[in-house]
Swiss-Prot record:
Lineage: Bacteria, Pseudomonadati, Pseudomonadota, Alphaproteobacteria, Rhodobacterales
BP terms from Gene Ontology: ribosomal small subunit assembly; translation
Name this polypeptide is given: Small ribosomal subunit protein uS19
One GO MF term: rRNA binding
Domain of life: Bacteria
Known function: Protein S19 forms a complex with S13 that binds strongly to the 16S ribosomal RNA.
Gene Ontology CC terms: cytoplasm; small ribosomal subunit
Keywords: Ribonucleoprotein, Ribosomal protein, RNA-binding, rRNA-binding
Pfam families from the UniProt entry: Ribosomal_S19
Source organism of this protein record: Jannaschia sp. (strain CCS1)
Amino acid sequence: MSRSVWKGPFVDSYVLKKAEKSKESGRNEVIKIWSRRSTILPQFVGLTFGVYNGRKHIPVNVTEDMIGQKFGEYSPTRTYYGHAADKKAKRK
C-alpha cells in the first residue's frame, strides 16, 4: 500500500536541515544520516549522503533517477557470501 498523496513525502527534519547547510556551504562533503526511511527529494540531487546500514555509512550520490525513492534502498544491510561448497563432492 502506497502513501496517501495528500500527506506528501516523508523526510526527517534533520535530513532537510543538513542538506540545506551543505548546499549553502558549497562544499561537497558526505552528509551522514541514519534515516533510511526518508524519501529522496529533488533538492537533494547532486549531494552525497552517507546512509547508515547498521554497521557503517554507505556513500550515496543522489541523481535525478532516485527522486521519490527511499535512502534505505541504496544502502544494503545484509551481505550474501554465497552457499557453502559441498565438502563431499570436493573430496572426490
